[in-house]
């Protein structure tokens, strides 16, 4: 296992591993100990009281962060006819049909998110083995298989985040750039956790939000008191 550098260890030394902080305290620690020259992303991990092995306890969804992610998102739309122009007018970086499928077959992957109209899913399915493992496959449950391209493309460009609970019961998601400042980051976190709570499966028993941690791209994790959720979510 690689050893952490002096700056990382210094940042970790400011954190009490036994303490569960408020969101404000945790953000002050996370953003106050930045030691990299680039604008780091703040990530959140929420441990839920669900068992994802059971279909009725799966948590999966999307949220449009009020302050975005602070980075450009390259959107590719699989469409044909007038829908190609609609996608491009909405802000898509790439839009087209079989020609894009062929480019991807050849190894082209210069995009971050994909959307498809339902009538294109047959063609898109041919590159499922390329897109699927990379988390790039359009998905009806996440709203990325649709004819309403204007709405979806604009949401993605504005900072739409897809998430799903992992086998361990943890959900990970980016919350924006450290440079946003505490107020905007808390607004993003609030929107995300509010969405998680709304998606609580009826089959989930006991405490739902069991653990929360935040970290910057290169920084150590900071534990947050799950009860602090009440201070940022109505």
From Swiss-Prot:
Classify the source by domain of life: Bacteria
Q: Which organism is it from?
A: Syntrophobacter fumaroxidans (strain DSM 10017 / MPOB)
Its biological purpose is as follows: Binds directly to 23S rRNA. The L1 stalk is quite mobile in the ribosome, and is involved in E site tRNA release. Protein L1 is also a translational repressor protein, it controls the translation of the L11 operon by binding to its mRNA.
A Gene Ontology molecular function term for this protein is: rRNA binding
> What Pfam families does the entry give?
Ribosomal_L1 (PF00687)
Q: Which GO terms describe its biological process?
A: regulation of translation; translation
Per the record, GO CC terms?
large ribosomal subunit
Kindly provide the name given to this protein in its UniProt entry.
Large ribosomal subunit protein uL1
> Subunit notes for this chain?
Part of the 50S ribosomal subunit.
Family that this chain belongs to: Belongs to the universal ribosomal protein uL1 family.
Report whether Repressor shows up as a keyword of the record. yes
Which keywords does this Swiss-Prot/TrEMBL entry list?
Answer: Repressor, Ribonucleoprotein, Ribosomal protein, RNA-binding, rRNA-binding, Translation regulation, tRNA-binding
